[in-house]
């Protein structure tokens, strides 16, 4: 997966979040979970599962004639690499520009400011 670009759609994130939460999930399990929150057809959800499988984000194993899907990527890794891709595209790789943009535009609480200071002090 290291040579992949980690391009993943918002809809694919929904599927990945369920797989990370459950560790192993059949297509029907994934469909049930998503349909509790979204009005997506089973066919749409199966298409998303197939895309993630073809992209190499998930794999499957047969368990009593039913495929159980599981993640091939750690949640923290894909979040990091997706964020890094975003920073490279939007901020030309300048992480400090990203942070500065958010700090200037967001109303941060004292707790959030203190948390940021603690994180930076650890570096």
Curated annotation (Swiss-Prot):
<dbReference type="InterPro" id="IPR036388">
    <property type="entry name" value="WH-like_DNA-bd_sf"/>
</dbReference>
<comment type="subunit">
    <text>Monomer and homodimer.</text>
</comment>
<dbReference type="GO" id="GO:0045892">
    <property type="term" value="P:negative regulation of DNA-templated transcription"/>
</dbReference>
<keyword id="KW-0805">Transcription regulation</keyword>
<dbReference type="InterPro" id="IPR005650">
    <property type="entry name" value="BlaI_family"/>
</dbReference>
<dbReference type="GO" id="GO:0005737">
    <property type="term" value="C:cytoplasm"/>
</dbReference>
<feature type="site" description="Cleavage">
    <location>
        <begin position="101"/>
        <end position="102"/>
    </location>
</feature>
<keyword id="KW-0804">Transcription</keyword>
<comment type="function">
    <text>Transcriptional repressor that constitutively blocks the transcription of the gene for the penicillin-binding protein MecA. Binds palindromic DNA with the sequence 5'-TACA-[AT]-N-TGTA-3'. Regulates genes involved in antibiotic resistance. Binds DNA as a dimer.</text>
</comment>
<keyword id="KW-0678">Repressor</keyword>
<dbReference type="GO" id="GO:0046677">
    <property type="term" value="P:response to antibiotic"/>
</dbReference>
<keyword id="KW-0238">DNA-binding</keyword>
<comment type="similarity">
    <text>Belongs to the BlaI transcriptional regulatory family.</text>
</comment>
<keyword id="KW-0963">Cytoplasm</keyword>
<feature type="DNA-binding region" description="H-T-H motif">
    <location>
        <begin position="7"/>
        <end position="71"/>
    </location>
</feature>
<keyword id="KW-0046">Antibiotic resistance</keyword>
<feature type="region of interest" description="Important for dimerization">
    <location>
        <begin position="74"/>
        <end position="123"/>
    </location>
</feature>
<dbReference type="Pfam" id="PF03965">
    <property type="entry name" value="Penicillinase_R"/>
</dbReference>
<dbReference type="GO" id="GO:0003677">
    <property type="term" value="F:DNA binding"/>
</dbReference>
<protein>
    <recommendedName>
        <fullName>Methicillin resistance regulatory protein MecI</fullName>
    </recommendedName>
</protein>
<dbReference type="InterPro" id="IPR036390">
    <property type="entry name" value="WH_DNA-bd_sf"/>
</dbReference>
């Amino acid at each position: 997966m290291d040579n992949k670009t980690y391009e993943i759609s918002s809809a694919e994130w929904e599927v990945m979040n369920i797989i990370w939460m459950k560790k192993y999930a059949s297509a029907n399990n994934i469909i049930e979970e998503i349909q509790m929150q979204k009005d997506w057809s089973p066919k749409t959800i199966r298409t998303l599962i197939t895309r993630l499988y073809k992209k190499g984000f998930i794999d499957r194993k047969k368990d009593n004639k039913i495929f159980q899907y599981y993640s091939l990527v750690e949640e923290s890794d894909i979040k990091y690499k997706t964020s890094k891709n975003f920073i490279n595209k939007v901020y030309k790789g300048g992480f400090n520009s990203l942070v500065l943009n958010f700090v200037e535009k967001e109303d941060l609480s004292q707790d959030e400011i203190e948390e940021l200071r603690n994180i930076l002090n650890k570096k």
